[in-house]
């Protein structure tokens, strides 16, 4: 059985989500994609991913924020600056951490869930935050 080629929306989904990778954005800027009018038209076209019927497929929703930022020429120029790129990356990581905290998913709660799933089974080690386990 032959594998079918990916559909256009699958390719666009993958590309839109790749925009959440700040180092990839820097690569695009270094190779002058972010100053190419055709590429910028494509970026503008991809705004349809902000619609709920499409955005529900996104695993990395921060890519939509980046898609918006890419509409700004100053952002496209600044992403070449290492300090700016690092600040954007750090801000994005903080957003992910804050979002996890809002939804109750923290490293501590994940570990507590693992320990609870172990129950009273003494053959299973428990998982502790400091990295040590017990039998």
UniProtKB/Swiss-Prot annotation:
The gene is SOH1. Component of the Mediator complex, a coactivator involved in the regulated transcription of nearly all RNA polymerase II-dependent genes. Mediator functions as a bridge to convey information from gene-specific regulatory proteins to the basal RNA polymerase II transcription machinery. Mediator is recruited to promoters by direct interactions with regulatory proteins and serves as a scaffold for the assembly of a functional preinitiation complex with RNA polymerase II and the general transcription factors. Keywords: Activator, Nucleus, Transcription, Transcription regulation. PANTHER family: MEDIATOR OF RNA POLYMERASE II TRANSCRIPTION SUBUNIT 31. InterPro entries: Med31_sf, Mediator_Med31. GO terms for cellular component: mediator complex. Component of the Mediator complex. One of its GO terms (biological process) is regulation of DNA-templated transcription. It is found in: Nucleus. Belongs to the Mediator complex subunit 31 family. GO terms for molecular function: transcription coregulator activity. Pfam families: Med31 (PF05669). It comes from Debaryomyces hansenii (strain ATCC 36239 / CBS 767 / BCRC 21394 / JCM 1990 / NBRC 0083 / IGC 2968). This is Mediator of RNA polymerase II transcription subunit 31. Residues 110-135 are annotated as: Disordered.
């Amino acid at each position: 059985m032959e594998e079918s080629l990916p559909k256009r929306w699958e390719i666009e989904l993958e590309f839109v989500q790749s925009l959440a990778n700040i180092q990839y954005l820097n690569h695009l800027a270094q190779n002058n994609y972010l100053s190419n009018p055709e590429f910028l038209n494509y970026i503008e076209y991809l705004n349809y991913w902000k619609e709920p019927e499409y955005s529900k497929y996104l695993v990395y929703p921060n890519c939509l924020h980046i898609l918006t930022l890419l509409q700004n020429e100053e952002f496209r120029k600044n992403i070449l600056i290492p300090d700016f790129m690092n600040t954007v990356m750090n801000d994005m990581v903080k957003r992910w951490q804050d979002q996890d905290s809002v939804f109750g998913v923290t490293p501590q709660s994940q570990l507590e869930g693992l320990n609870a799933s172990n129950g009273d089974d003494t053959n299973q080690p428990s998982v502790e935050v400091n990295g040590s386990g017990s039998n």
